[in-house]
Amino acid sequence: MKVTRRTASIGALGLLAASSLSPAHALDDPLLDPFEGKSDFWLAVEAYIYGYPLVTMEMTRRVITNVAKVAGTKGPMGQIIKLREYPNASFTDVTAPNADTLYTTAFVDVGKEPWVFSIPEMKDRYYLFPMLDGWTTVFQVPGKRTTGGEPQTYAITGPGWEGKLPDGVTEYKSPTSIVWILGRIYCTGTPEDYKAVHELQDQCNLVPLSSYGKDWKPSVGKVDPKIDMKTAVREQVNRMDAVEYFTLLSELMKTNPPTAEDAPMVEKMAEIGIVPGKDFDKSKLDAHFVKRVPEIAFARIMLHFKFSDGDIADINGWGYTTKTGIYGTNYLQRALITAIGLGANRPEDAIYPTSTKSKDGLFSRAYAGSEDYVLTFPKGQTPPVKGFWSITMYNEKYFFVDNPINRYSISARQDLKPNADGSIDIYIQNKSPGVDKESNWLPAPKGKFILMMRLYWPDDKSPSILDGSWVIPPAKKT
């Protein structure tokens, strides 16, 4: 038998999917059955991957907005959520959360009318307010890099909207009805800087166009007791069977239409009962596929991290991509970013190198809290950025790790101590490296963990991660 890249990938998919099945399931329903001449099965897998961002975005919206009033990390539709301090280890609303900025966010439905969003004068402070459509595409991103620090006001309009806007209001047209304003304002975390950022957050304003310039007060949010507010969104999505998943996808596409680029995919999905603007026709989906499609599709999404056809670079144990925020027809890449970093920015705004294994020469091994690691930046070679950089610690599910010093990321704001030669060591371990080294300590859990580096507004001139002229050092076992 000749082993091709496709058969190797299928084999890897089988191993990944099998690991998530019980032994009884694996024996009673052989894993390889769907692989044998079932073109409809693979089409359903494609459709699942295609729709993963939209379904995940909707489930995220439901959980975040299912409250009567703004509180903590949640707030009703059309109301600004202002995080007043960094998220802690209990935060599971969004995978790979940020511990370097104060989120200032809101979900709006621009299907019925536009919403007007105003940003105050930011001066020299780093900030950005990316606007994501239902498919996780960043269709606009006002911020320090793009629009500067002056006061600015935008009307976010939905598909097919035509009308006149007030003077001084710039139109940002969303391709979908769902819009997530996922603002980030840099904050050092000191009491003084918290206060300064809180004042900026309070000056941000969001109102429906019909109430712009009026004394508008948001209504009490509607709470749906049937929505699961405890289980992480990704787990809720992954637990859906194919019928439930495609039913929701079809419903969402009525107000969050595919793009013109998606036409070939839309045509194929019709064969299994998925048609934009119509309810899902489950009679066209083989009943034997209902449980297996989500398992295999999600395994394929995660496998893309290793078999990415160039979408993911792998250097010194760090995987990263410059293909985020705008995806075109690269549905697999879009789904992967949704799974491991929902809300990712455009590469000009941020790059997110991620590492799951320590690499030393030809050898690599999964990170474990039972071992100690060190990452060394040579003198003058900390990450080249115009915004900020950090390294964040996550558990194996991409959530924060509880630790005795409540530190979830490390960056220049820790006042890192250099070595005698000017290099900087970052100590990555479960136990403290000692009082004299704690400024450079990134606490790890006892079990497996993941590292994510954030490079906000990376330099576009050499040395730069954008063109590969700056190389991330490895985290080595000590």
Residue ranges and their predicted role:
Residues 18-24:
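C-terminal segment of classical bacterial N-terminal signal peptides
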Residues 27-478:
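A compositional/structural signature for long, glycine/proline-rich flexible linkers
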Residues 15-18, 321:
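Intrinsically disordered, low-complexity, compositionally biased regions/tails
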Residues 1-15:
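N-terminal secretory signal peptides and thylakoid transit peptides that target proteins
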